[in-house]
């Protein structure tokens, strides 16, 4: 993994910082694990914008990643590491002993030729997936399930990890990267190690067009709009004249928006603000 600062041959290249990984496969992805990916432009089925700042971007194929890791007792070998345009982490193509191939998230330290396994009796080794009741307290894990069998939902981005703090009865206590401490059923699965490509945070796109390639449109401040477009718009000078709100009038600072009271009992400590 190398961090490359581009030479200022043009204004758009002057501030570009790239992450170069020589271990990534340079060929085409495995065709059987690709799916089509249509762009919505942030619109719903009525054609109305439901998510702002989305539109355009390069055409992409979706890589079908195995988040369940449910092939228990069947050893697998890592064939190669690949780039995935749909996520910040890299992915690994693994070949199971029964001949099936699957994509998984590539943990830090995993390389081509390594052996991995899944199941309750799997070894405590980077890349192996097993129920958290079988993982020692204090271990670092990623790709953590929130419900048994549902598939990984927590700690899937580049460089993220979760630490197992305690095990009490049917639950384990986890500390997330956000600082939140929460309980999850001990039967939920997790993968040993942290997600790879942790240098992703050091990259610099260098120009607005690089964001457009990724399907991200500009974000305009409400104060720069007209009153018809945003509550902060209009007025003389640079004064919003009110408490900061969203384009639809909801308070933007200090207003609690969490609605799922049913799962509050599993949160031991809220995330760091």
Curated annotation (Swiss-Prot):
Pfam entry (one): Ribosomal_L2_C
Basic residues bias (residue ranges): 253-273
Polar residues bias: start-end ranges: 39-49
Ranges of biased composition (kind: Basic and acidic residues): 229-239
Region listing for Disordered, in residue ranges: 35-54, 222-273
Keyword Repeat assigned: no
Any one GO CC term of the record: large ribosomal subunit
GO terms classed as biological process: cytoplasmic translation
GO molecular function, one term: rRNA binding
Alphabetical UniProt keywords: Ribonucleoprotein, Ribosomal protein, RNA-binding, rRNA-binding
Annotated NCBIfam families: rplB_bact (TIGR01171)
Record text on subunit structure and interactions: Part of the 50S ribosomal subunit. Forms a bridge to the 30S subunit in the 70S ribosome.
Chain's role: One of the primary rRNA binding proteins. Required for association of the 30S and 50S subunits to form the 70S ribosome, for tRNA binding and peptide bond formation. It has been suggested to have peptidyltransferase activity; this is somewhat controversial. Makes several contacts with the 16S rRNA in the 70S ribosome.
HAMAP family in UniProt: Ribosomal_uL2_B (MF_01320_B)
Family: Belongs to the universal ribosomal protein uL2 family.
Protein name: Large ribosomal subunit protein uL2
Organism the protein comes from: Aeromonas salmonicida (strain A449)
Lineage: Bacteria, Pseudomonadati, Pseudomonadota, Gammaproteobacteria, Aeromonadales
Gene: rplB
